[in-house]
Amino acid sequence: MAGFGLPNFGQLTEAFKKAKQIQQDAQKLQDELENMEIEGKSDDEMIKVWISGNQLPLKVEVQENIFNSNKEQIEKNILQAIKKAHELSTTTMKERMNDLTGGLNLNLPGFDNSDS
């Protein structure tokens, strides 16, 4: 510590460098998540959906013979596929954010920090 309870200039400069690096890495991660295509499937694989690492829907694939099923089964399959894709996407985002922050507990909204 320098005089008056302030950190020395070298420590302050290093802290700013680290903050700038985290900011750059966060932008890179944002771009990476945006370009990901994460697939979720219904249990019977009749419905597949893809969402980005940012949880944006990208596309849906439906097997032709799904239309032989009843309405409730089709709805169930769609929901299963969406839930699985969303779960994989949020897990991926949390893991990548944890990698970025080095396990720091930043208490970011939308992230469960109790895992850290």
Curated annotation (Swiss-Prot):
Entry's Gene Ontology molecular function annotations: DNA binding
Keywords, sorted A to Z: Cytoplasm, DNA-binding
Keyword Cytoplasm found: yes
Keyword Transcription regulation: no
Domain of life: Bacteria
Main location: cytoplasm
Localization, UniProt: Cytoplasm, Nucleoid
InterPro entries: YbaB-like_sf, YbaB/EbfC
GO cellular component: a single term: cytosol
Listed transmembrane segments: none
Functional summary from the UniProt entry: Binds to DNA and alters its conformation. May be involved in regulation of gene expression, nucleoid organization and DNA protection.
Complexes and interactors: Homodimer.
Entry similarity comment: Belongs to the YbaB/EbfC family.
Protein name listed in UniProt: Nucleoid-associated protein A9601_00191
Organism field: Prochlorococcus marinus (strain AS9601)
